[in-house]
Amino acid sequence: TVCNLRRCQLSCRSLGLLGKCIGVKCECVKH
């Protein structure tokens, strides 16, 4: 599967984090 950046950012934003694609993985990182 490919990382969907927009969906990744949305799900991370709800945690107060920044969404980033690392390879095929969605990573939530601090701003």
From Swiss-Prot:
InterPro entries: Scorpion_toxin-like_sf, Scorpion_toxinS_K_inh. Changing residue 24 to D: No change in potency of inhibition of KCa2.2/KCNN2 and KCa2.3/KCNN3. Residues 6-9 are annotated as: [R/K]XCQ motif. Changing residue 1 to A: 50-fold and 3-fold increase in potency of inhibition of KCa2.2/KCNN2 and KCa2.3/KCNN3, respectively. GO terms for cellular component: extracellular region. Keywords: Calcium-activated potassium channel impairing toxin, Disulfide bond, Ion channel impairing toxin, Neurotoxin, Potassium channel impairing toxin, Secreted, Toxin. PROSITE patterns: SCORP_SHORT_TOXIN. The record marks 1-2, 7, 24 as: Interacts with KCa2.2/KCNN2 and KCa2.3/KCNN3. The keyword Secreted applies. Expressed by the venom gland. Its main location: secreted. This is Potassium channel toxin alpha-KTx 5.2. It comes from Androctonus mauritanicus mauritanicus (Scorpion). The lineage of its organism: Eukaryota, Metazoa, Ecdysozoa, Arthropoda, Chelicerata.
